[in-house]
A protein has these predicted regions:
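C-terminal motif of bacterial Sec signal peptides marking the signal peptidase cleavage site
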Residues: 18-22
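Beta-strand/beta-sandwich contexts
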Residues: 24-83, 130-173, 211, 220-244
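Short, aromatic- and glycine-rich surface loops/edge beta-strands on solvent-exposed regions
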Residues: 117-129, 209-220, 439-443
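Extra-cytoplasmic beta-strand recognition segments
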Residues: 239-241, 312-341, 411, 461
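Secreted extracellular polysaccharide-interacting domains
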Residues: 275-321, 350, 365-397
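Extracellular beta-strand ligand-recognition surfaces/modules
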Residues: 325-326, 342-347, 368-372, 378-391, ...
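Beta-strand acidic-aromatic groove motif in beta-rich domains, primarily in extracellular
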Residues: 334-358
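Extracellular beta-strand elements of beta-rich domains used
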Residues: 456-463
Length: 467
C-alpha cells in the first residue's frame, strides 16, 4: 500500500481504539444520533481479503481498502455520522451491531455468516427513523467447507451425511457430492437432503464408490475433503488381518463379528453386563484394550509382526496435523453414561510387553498401567502425568449412544493433553517415538456420571492427516 494509505490506516485504528475505550467505559451512554450516515470507504480488519479488480494472488493485509469480503470477516466502515446507524444489512442478512465499536466516523462490524437469499451486492445502513443508505459491497460466498462425515466406512448404498458450511444448492449449479471409483474417476452421490442453513448434506453412497477422496462442489467452487472414504492410510488396528495387530497386553479383549458388523471384526469394550460405576472406577478386565510394543525375545523385536512399534507401522510425522480416527457403535440398549475413554500413546521408555532390552534404546519399561493408576516411581508419567485423549461425549446430555449405527470418531493428536485425572498437562507425546504403544481404557477422567453397562464397539483404528 502507499504511504498515505498507511497513515489513513493508523488514523482509523486510532479512532477505533478510542471507540473501544470510550464506549466500554460508559456502555450506558451510547445513543444513536439523528441525521443520515455516509460511508467514504471500508477497510478490512481480517488477514486475507481480495479486491475484485486485483490479481488472483493479491493478498490484502490488515487495514487495506476493500470492496468485497467473505462471511465472518471484520470490517471498519469509515465515514460520517455512523452513530446514527440503527440497523445494518449485507444483502438481506442483518448485522449484529456492537455499540462499543461505533463512533461518529468509524463503525466496526462482522459480515454475517448467514447465506443471503436475495443478492443485491449492497450494504444497507438504516437509521432509527428508517432512512436507508446504500453502499456497493460484494459478499464473497466461499466454496464448500467440509468438516466431517457421519461414518467414513458407511456401506455402499446406505445414507450418510457430511457436515460443513456453504453446502449450497443452486438451481443453475446443483450441489454435488463426489466419490472416487476403482479407476480413479469421480462418481456422484444421490443427494437426499440439504440443511436449510447449508451446514449438512445427506446422500446415498454410490454402489461403485471405492476407497479414495471425496469432494463437494457448488456454484461457488469445489473442495476436497481431508479424509478419504474407507480410508486405510495409517491403519493400526482393523481386526481383520490387514495389519495383523490386536490384543498385545494384559487382557484379551473380545474381537468378533455379529449382525451389527461394519466391515468384519470389531473390538468390544464392555459385555456380559459389566458395569461402570458413577466415577467409572478401575475395571481393566472389561474396559481396557492394550497394545504394548515389543516381544518376548531378547532383544525385543519392534520392527515387524505382532508387537511392532506403532511408529514403525504408521507415519506419525507432523503429528500436530493428524488425528486418531475410529468407527464406533454403541447400541441404544446400552448407553454410555460414566467415565472417559482414555486414549493413550506411549514410548518404549514407559511400557513394552516384556521389558527386555531393545537395540538402540537405553531405557525400556516392562508391562505396567502406571500411566492410568499413578502408582509408579519412574517419573511424572508413572504418576499418571502423561498426556492422553479424554473422549466423553455423554457429558453433553448425560448419556450417549450412536442410535444403533456406526459413526466416525475423530481425536486430534493435539488433544492428547490430559493427565489421568482429566487435568491439562504439558507432558504430552510429541516425538515420533512417543507413539510406540497404545491403550484405550474407559475409566475415571475426573468426572462423575451415572452407573451404566455400556457396550462400545470399535473398528478401524487409524492415524490420518486432518489438514
Amino acid at each position: 500500500m502507499k504511504k498515505t494509505n498507511n497513515i489513513l490506516l493508523l488514523a482509523a485504528i486510532a479512532a477505533a481504539g478510542f471507540a473501544f475505550t470510550s464506549c466500554e467505559d460508559q456502555p450506558d451512554k451510547f445513543e444513536n444520533t439523528s441525521g443520515i450516515p455516509s460511508v467514504n470507504y471500508i477497510r478490512s480488519l481480517s488477514g486475507e481479503t481480495q479486491n475484485r479488480n486485483d490479481e488472483e494472488d493479491r493478498k490484502y493485509t490488515y487495514g487495506e481498502l476493500v470492496e468485497q469480503a467473505s462471511p465472518q470477516e471484520v470490517l471498519c466502515l469509515v465515514g460520517n455520522n455512523l452513530k446514527s446507524v440503527y440497523k445494518a444489512f449485507f444483502n438481506d442478512c442483518e448485522v449484529t451491531l456492537n455499540t462499543s465499536y461505533m463512533e461518529d466516523k468509524t463503525l466496526i462490524l462482522t459480515v454475517p455468516e448467514q447465506i443471503p437469499t436475495r443478492v443485491t451486492d449492497k450494504l444497507y445502513l438504516v437509521t432509527k427513523s428508517n432512512d436507508t443508505v446504500k453502499y456497493d459491497f460484494h459478499i464473497i460466498i466461499p466454496a464448500p467447507t467440509i468438516n466431517n462425515m457421519s461414518c467414513e466406512y458407511a456401506e455402499r448404498g446406505s445414507v450418510a451425511s457430511i457436515s460443513g458450511k456453504y453446502l449450497i444448492n443452486d438451481p443453475s449449479f446443483p450441489l454435488a457430492v463426489k466419490f472416487t471409483d476403482k479407476n480413479g474417476n469421480q462418481v456422484n452421490a444421490d443427494i437426499k437432503k440439504i440443511a436449510e442453513d447449508y451446514t449438512s448434506v445427506d446422500f446415498v453412497i454410490p454402489e461403485n464408490a471405492a476407497e479414495g477422496s471425496i469432494a463437494i462442489s457448488s456454484i461457488y467452487g469445489e473442495t476436497k475433503a481431508s479424509f478419504n472414504y474407507m480410508d486405510s492410510r495409517g491403519m493400526l488396528f482393523d481386526f481383520d488381518g490387514k495389519t495383523g495387530l490386536g490384543n498385545h497386553g494384559w487382557h484379551s479383549r473380545t474381537i468378533k463379528s455379529d449382525e451389527t458388523s461394519l466391515c468384519g471384526n470389531f473390538l468390544q469394550l464392555g459385555e456380559n453386563g459389566a458395569t461402570l460405576s458413577e466415577d467409572a472406577g478401575w475395571d481393566d478386565a472389561n474396559f481396557s484394550f492394550e497394545y504394548w510394543a515389543g516381544s518376548w525375545d531378547t532383544p525385543q523385536n519392534i520392527t515387524s509382526g505382532d508387537g511392532i512399534a506403532l511408529f514403525n507401522l504408521a507415519d506419525f510425522k507432523d503429528s500436530q496435523n493428524k488425528a486418531l480416527k475410529f468407527e464406533m457403535y454403541i447400541p441404544s440398549s446400552n448407553p454410555w453414561q460414566a467415565g472417559a475413554m482414555q486414549i493413550c500413546f506411549q514410548p518404549l521408555e514407559q511400557v513394552t510387553i516384556s521389558g527386555n532390552a531393545i537395540e538402540g534404546y537405553d531405557n525400556v519399561a516392562a508391562a505396567n498401567m502406571y500411566v492410568f493408576n499413578g502408582e509408579g516411581t519412574g517419573g511424572d508419567w508413572a504418576k499418571g502425568n502423561w498426556g492422553r485423549g479424554m473422549y466423553r461425549p455423554w457429558t453433553d446430555t448425560g448419556k450417549f449412544d450412536t442410535g444403533d449405527k456406526w459413526i466416525t470418531v475423530t481425536i486430534p493428536l493435539t488433544s492428547l493433553i490430559y493427565d489421568r485425572t482429566g487435568a491439562v498437562t504439558s507432558n504430552t507425546p510429541s516425538k515420533e517415538t512417543d507413539f510406540a504403544s497404545f491403550t484405550m481404557f474407559v475409566m475415571g477422567g475426573g468426572i462423575t456420571g451415572t452407573e451404566c453397562s455400556p457396550i462400545i464397539k470399535v473398528d478401524n483404528i487409524r492415524v490420518v492427516p486432518i489438514k
